[in-house]
Amino acid sequence: MNKCPFYLLVFPALILSLTGCSNIQPKANPAYDYVAEGRGTWLSTKMETDWDSTMAVLSKAGFNMVFPFMCSAGSARYPSKILPMVGQRDELTLCLQAAHKYGIEVHALVVPWKLESGPDSVQKRMMEEGRTQFGYDGKPYSQVALQFGYRQNYETLCPSREDNRKLLYDYVMELAKNYDVDGINFDHFRFSFEPLCYCNNCKENFIKESGLKITKWPDDVWKDGPYREAYLDWRRELMISSVREITKAIHDYNPYICTSLCARRQLKVTYEIDAQEWWKWIREGLLDFVAPMDYSDEPEEYVHLIKQQFPLIKGALPYYGGVGVFRMKEFEPVKKAIELGRGIGEDGYVTFNINSLLPLLEQFKAAGVNSLPALLPHRAPETRFYVESSGRESEEGFKIFAPGSEVNFKVDVMFKAKLRQGISRIWGDVVLTKTSGEIVAKIKSFDLNEATIANLSVTCGEEGLYRLAFYGTMTLSNGDVRPFITKSFPFEISSS
């Protein structure tokens, strides 16, 4: 048995024994007619939307996911028994009908703590009940935001209060149970600024749970205070514990529904200030894919951000980079960012936002940015890859092997996926690909009817970035047959 101290967790995936290469026969397998890629866009508008025409143009441009804002802690864009409804229409139903008509998944965007778009009466009641966040100096969230240059006319609930956590649980589960969503995409699942939160509830809970003797609040936990690090740890645990509660409830209710996150890009800031240690959330299996908000003006900066984040993920789940179309504005830099992201091994992209994207869609089609139909990586069968140690690793977390080296793997194939049906059969081809998508070699074909663990190996001569892939077909328990493609975390062949 090979020692495998490092593993590639291939998000919904399947790869089997690899021992030698043979010529590719693409037409023998329907999966070769596709690529594996999530192509999405965030729709942050809170106005009425022409959902049918929007989904029609997105579909024609090759998009397969949308992330529409649907609710916050203060309002919902659909009828709710828990949240006040804004607008006159059930926007979520209209969105789902249109998106599913065109084969597009809907991952409803949920903002957990902010009372955004909510009526003044709700804001007032929450503040009177002491349920909102307060800064170090006792100022409410809206005034703290002003200090950082943000004019926000709403308050934010404190996640240390059980009634606020129950509110989040209740309205998210109401959405999951009442609507046929494909996923729930969390945004702002964090604190927004460093001086938050220092309310009385945070004080009482921190003292109780830490067992520390606090003599000067909040000075003891602020800046150079003796218990600052303990308080930051407590804030991070406060946030992840809430994520655990709600994602477990969603997955227990309906395993098909994906949970995902609009992750913050600045790793130090999100760790210390936001209390959003999202890479730990990934390691605990709380998310089904992640979409870091890697907004930048230049394509090269976009890829630089990806390189910083890759070592924290290492293929544990699909990575869909957040492309800031609103900042790049023109088509060419957006196109280049997507191409560079593909080249380094991201699994797809999500653009921000729809208003900036729509004027570019004709150019998307003309340039063939999404020319091949795409299969969603997060809907493929699940597999874990265990890769032997090479002794070298790049800054992106890629294992580095010398040209001509034999790379040994162990693969754990599981007959489960984020689907509405179970899986009864999986068959297809294991191939070696470049990160650009070019298939280098077909390695072996398999036909399985049960979970399998296999040892495998492959030899690569030419320098470059590679991914193992399974181009396959799965038979579901209801008889449906679906193609899928799944890929490993990249590895590098290099003589340097």
Annotated model-derived regions:
Residues 32-38, 107-179:
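Active-site-adjacent "subsite" loops/lids of carbohydrate-active enzymes
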Residues 286-302, 309, 317-386:
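Substrate-binding cleft of secreted/luminal carbohydrate-active enzymes
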Residues 72-111, 234-253:
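Aromatic-lined substrate-binding rim segments of carbohydrate-active enzymes
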Residues 369-406, 414, 496:
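Short, compositionally biased P/S/T/A/G/V-rich stretches that sit at domain boundaries
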Residues 209-330:
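Glycoside hydrolase catalytic-domain groove-lining segments
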